[in-house]
Swiss-Prot record:
Keywords: ATP-binding, Glutamine amidotransferase, Ligase, Nucleotide-binding, Phosphoprotein, Pyrimidine biosynthesis
One MF term in the entry's GO annotations: ATP binding
Domain Glutamine amidotransferase type-1: 300-554
Organism lineage string: Eukaryota, Metazoa, Chordata, Craniata, Vertebrata
Protein's UniProt keywords contain Nuclease: no
GO CC terms of this entry: cytoophidium; cytoplasm
EC number annotated for this UniProt entry: 6.3.4.2
Record's protein name: CTP synthase 2
CDD domains in UniProt: CTPS_N, GATase1_CTP_Synthase
SUPFAM superfamilies tied to this protein: Class I glutamine amidotransferase-like, P-loop containing nucleoside triphosphate hydrolases
Length: 586
C-alpha cells in the first residue's frame, strides 16, 4: 500500500480537496486502484448537524455517512463509493479511544495524545485504506489522505504527529507528502510572493514532515524565477514545485498536474508499476476541459434555496447540473435566488431585492428547488414552484423541494388551503407531509433516513424511468425525516400528480411527475450525490434537456446521446441538433 498525504498551508480553502482528487484521478488513469481518506480536525463526530453556512453542504454516502463535501469530490473524480469511515474526525478518534479506555483495553495505563490518539489515527488509516471502494473485491493500491485545515492549527497537531510517526512505519518508498500552499500576488505590485510558502514549509518541517512536492496555488502561472526561489528555500528540486493557477474548470486540474510530470515523479518516488503516461481516462478529462472552455450555448437554471449566500451549500447540486449541461453541450448559467427574496414581506421591506429576484426567476429556462430544513423561506419556494407549474417551466424538486411541490399542488389544485407539513406546523389541519415513524425527536444527529435506498417504479409510462434506462427500480441516496402522507395519495393522483416511484414496501412516496407538463418532477432522494462527470444524474439531465427543449427528442432516440455529444471535441453545436431536426417532437 502506498500513502499520499496532502497537507495545506497559509490559508484553508485553497483547493486541497480538488488537488487530492486530481492526483487520485491521474493514478487511477495509470491503472492503479485508488481510495481516499479525508481528515477533519473538528471535534464533531460527523458533519450531520453542521449548519450549511458553517461547513458547506453535508455529503451523504451509500452507507448513510454524513461527511465533508470533499468526499463528494473524491467520489466524482475517482468514480468510487466511499464509506463513513473514510472521513476521520477528531470526535471519532477520541470517541474510539475513550470507548477502548472504558472497556479496559489499555489495561489501566494513562491514556494520552501520544501514543494512544496518534496510534488510533494510524490504525484507522491503515485499516480503511484496505477497504475496496470501486465495486471490486481487490484492495486499493494507493490511498490519498487529505488533512483538513492548515499546518500550525492546534486542532491538527495530533494528526501531524501521527503522520510524522507513520512515515517511518510505512517506509519512505510507501509514503509521500504533498504540501499545497498559496502564492499571493498583490494587485499593488503584481509580484508573486513566496514568503508565505516558505514559512508554511518551514512550519511543516519543524513538525517532522518534509514535503516531496509543493503545489503552489496562484491566480496566474508562477514564473520560473519564483519556482526556483521556492525550490531553494524549501529544500526541494525545481521539478518538485508544481503550479496550479486559477482555471475556468476543475476538469483542467488533473491535466495541469500531468503536464508537469507528476506521473513520472510518482513512478520513481513510490516505485509504482506504471508507465510514464496516463491512459485514455485522462484523455477524456482533457477533452472535457477543452470542451468546457469552448461551449457557446447557455442554459439558465434558477436555484431557489435558503442557503444561497455560500455556494458550497449546494456544491453537489451545482456539479450535477454542470455534468448534465456539459453532456448536452451547453454552458450552465446557475442563478442563485434566496427564496425569502420572492416573498411578499421582502416586497415591503426591500422592493429592489424582491423585483431582482423575480426577474431572475422569470428569465430562467428551468427551476430547481433543492433540499433543506426549517420553515424559513418556504413561502418563496412555494411561489417559485407555483410559477413553474402554472407556466409550464421545467421544474425539479429534490427532497424538501418535492415535499413543497406536493403541498403547493394540494393548496392550488385540490383547494386544500390548509395543506402543510408537520415540520412547519405540527398541528396542521391537512398534513400533506408527515414525520416518519422511526424518527426520534430527542436527538438530531443520526436520526434521519440516510443512505442508499431502493425506489421501485410503479408504472412504465414515466419520464424518470426512461431517463434511468427503463429499469424497474433504482437505488439513490436519501437524507430526510419527513415524507408525503400516504392517505392523501389517491386525491392527488386524481388531479394528475402521479407518484410513479415508491419504496420497496409501497409505503413511502419517492418520485412525483405531473401530467401535461414539459418536466415537473420531484424526488425524495438526493440524486446529485451519485452524479459523475461522465455519468450525469438522470433527474438533473432531464431538467437540462427540458430547459433546452430537447427532452422529447432525447426520449424518442432511446435516451442516448450521440457520439458527438459525450465529451468529444465537437462542441460548437448544442445537443445533437441535426438529428433533432429530423425527429418529430411530440
Amino acid at each position: 500500500m502506498k500513502y499520499i498525504l496532502v497537507t495545506g498551508g497559509v490559508i484553508s480553502g485553497i483547493g486541497k480537496g480538488i488537488i487530492a482528487s486530481s492526483i487520485g484521478t491521474i493514478l487511477k488513469s495509470c491503472g492503479l486502484r485508488v481510495t481516499a481518506i479525508k481528515i477533519d480536525p473538528y471535534i464533531n463526530i460527523d458533519a450531520g448537524t453542521f449548519s450549511p453556512y458553517e461547513h458547506g453542504e453535508v455529503f451523504v454516502l451509500n452507507d448513510g455517512g454524513e461527511v465533508d463535501l470533499d468526499l463528494g469530490n473524491y467520489e466524482r473524480f475517482l468514480d468510487i463509493n466511499l464509506y463513513k469511515d473514510n472521513n476521520i474526525t477528531t470526535g471519532k478518534i477520541y470517541q474510539h479511544v475513550i470507548n477502548k479506555e472504558r472497556r479496559g483495553d489499555y489495561l489501566g495505563k494513562t491514556v494520552q495524545v501520544v501514543p494512544h490518539i496518534t496510534d488510533a489515527v494510524q490504525e484507522w488509516v491503515m485499516n480503511q485504506a484496505m477497504v475496496p471502494v470501486d465495486g471490486h473485491k481487490e484492495e486499493p493500491q494507493i490511498c490519498v489522505i487529505e488533512l483538513g485545515g492548515t499546518i500550525g492549527d492546534i486542532e491538527g497537531m495530533p494528526f501531524v504527529e501521527a503522520f510524522r510517526q507513520f512515515q517511518f512505519k510505512a517506509k519512505r518508498e510507501n509514503f509521500c507528502n504533498i504540501h499545497v500552499s498559496l502564492v499571493p500576488q498583490p494587485s499593488a505590485t503584481g509580484e508573486q510572493k513566496t514568503k508565505p510558502t516558505q514559512n508554511s514549509v518551514r512550519a511543516l518541517r519543524g513538525l517532522g514532515l518534509s514535503p516531496d512536492l509543493i503545489v503552489c496555488r496562484s491566480s496566474t502561472p508562477i514564473e520560473m524565477a519564483v519556482k526556483e526561489k521556492i525550490s531553494m528555500f524549501c529544500h526541494v528540486n525545481p521539478e518538485q514545485v508544481i503550479c496550479i493557477h486559477d482555471v475556468s474548470s476543475t476538469y483542467r486540474v488533473p491535466v495541469l498536474l500531468e503536464e508537469q510530470g507528476i506521473i513520472k515523479y510518482f513512478k520513481e518516488r513510490l516505485d509504482l508499476p506504471i508507465g510514464d503516461s496516463a491512459s485514455s481516462l485522462l484523455s477524456k478529462w482533457r477533452n472535457m476541459a477543452d470542451r468546457y472552455e469552448r461551449l457557446q450555448k447557455t442554459c439558465s437554471i434558477a436555484l431557489v434555496g435558503k442557503y444561497t449566500k455560500l455556494r458550497d451549500c449546494y456544491a453537489s447540486v451545482f456539479k450535477a447540473l454542470e455534468h448534465s449541461a456539459l453532456a448536452i453541450n451547453h454552458k450552465l448559467n446557475l442563478m442563485y435566488i434566496d427564496s425569502i427574496d420572492l416573498e411578499q414581506t421582502t416586497e415591503v421591506e426591500d422592493p429592489v431585492k424582491f423585483h431582482e429576484a423575480w426577474q431572475k426567476l422569470c428569465k430562467a429556462d428551468g427551476v430547481l428547488v433543492p433540499g433543506g430544513f426549517g420553515i424559513r423561506g418556504t413561502l418563496g419556494k412555494l411561489q417559485a414552484i407555483s410559477w413553474a407549474r402554472s407556466r409550464k417551466i421545467p421544474f425539479l424538486g429534490v427532497c424538501l423541494g418535492m415535499q413543497l411541490a406536493v403541498i403547493e399542488f394540494a393548496r392550488n389544485c385540490l383547494n386544500l388551503k390548509d395543506a402543510d407539513s408537520t415540520e412547519f406546523e405540527p398541528n396542521a389541519r391537512v398534513p400533506v407531509v408527515i414525520d416518519m415513524p422511526e424518527h426520534n425527536p430527542g436527538n438530531l444527529g443520526g436520526t434521519m433516513r440516510l443512505g442508499i435506498r431502493r425506489t421501485v417504479f410503479k408504472t412504465e409510462n414515466s419520464i424518470l424511468r426512461k431517463l434511468y434506462g427503463d429499469v424497474p427500480f433504482i437505488e439513490e441516496r436519501h437524507r430526510h425525516r419527513y415524507e408525503v402522507n400516504p392517505s392523501l395519495i389517491s386525491q392527488l393522483e386524481q388531479k394528475d400528480l402521479s407518484f410513479v416511484g415508491q419504496d420497496v414496501d409501497g409505503e413511502r412516496m419517492e418520485i412525483i411527475e405531473l401530467a401535461n407538463h414539459p418536466y415537473f418532477v420531484g424526488v425524495q432522494f438526493h440524486p446529485e450525490f451519485s452524479s459523475r462527470p461522465m455519468k450525469p444524474s438522470p433527474p438533473y439531465l432531464g431538467l437540462l434537456l427540458a430547459a433546452t427543449g430537447n427532452l422529447n427528442a432525447y426520449l424518442l432516440q432511446g435516451c442516448k446521446l450521440s457520439s458527438s455529444d459525450r465529451y468529444s471535441d465537437a462542441s460548437d453545436d448544442s445537443f445533437s441538433e441535426p438529428r433533432l431536426a429530423e425527429l418529430e417532437i411530440s
